UniProtKB/Swiss-Prot annotation:
Its biological purpose: May block potassium channels.
The record's note on its domains: Has the structural arrangement of an alpha-helix connected to antiparallel beta-sheets by disulfide bonds (CS-alpha/beta).
Disulphide bonds in the chain: C28-C46, C33-C59, C37-C61
Protein name per the record: U10-buthitoxin-Hj1a
Family the UniProt entry places it in: Belongs to the short scorpion toxin superfamily. Potassium channel inhibitor family. Alpha-KTx 23 subfamily.
Keyword Disulfide bond included in the entry's annotation: yes
Gene Ontology MF terms: potassium channel regulator activity; toxin activity
Signal sequence region: 1-22
Keyword terms, alphabetized: Disulfide bond, Ion channel impairing toxin, Neurotoxin, Potassium channel impairing toxin, Secreted, Signal, Toxin
């Protein structure tokens, strides 16, 4: 019984770790974002958007 409990705890820890690290679908490089938006005479900013269970860090020009 104790072995089953330990396996269950380890499984939950690994599952949580994958959920946290695996949810980010894209990264935003702030310097590249600002450079791209400067060409449009706008300010660049990295924003976080969610869709379903995924988190996107996108570059937006304002």
């Amino acid at each position: 019984m104790q072995k089953i409990f330990i396996i269950l705890v380890l499984f939950c820890i690994l599952k949580f770790n994958v959920d946290v690290e695996g949810r980010i679908a894209s990264q935003c490089d702030l310097s590249a974002c600002k450079e791209r938006c400067e060409k449009q005479n706008k300010n660049g900013k990295c924003v976080i958007e969610t869709e379903m269970d995924l988190v996107y860090r996108l570059c937006k020009c304002y």
